[in-house]
Amino acid sequence: PARNKDQEQEVLTXI
């Protein structure tokens, strides 16, 4: 269930 955190990190590192 760490996919929600992974998605949030992708947005932060996406910048």
UniProtKB/Swiss-Prot annotation:
It comes from the Eukaryota. This is Unknown protein 8 from 2D-page. It comes from Bombyx mori.
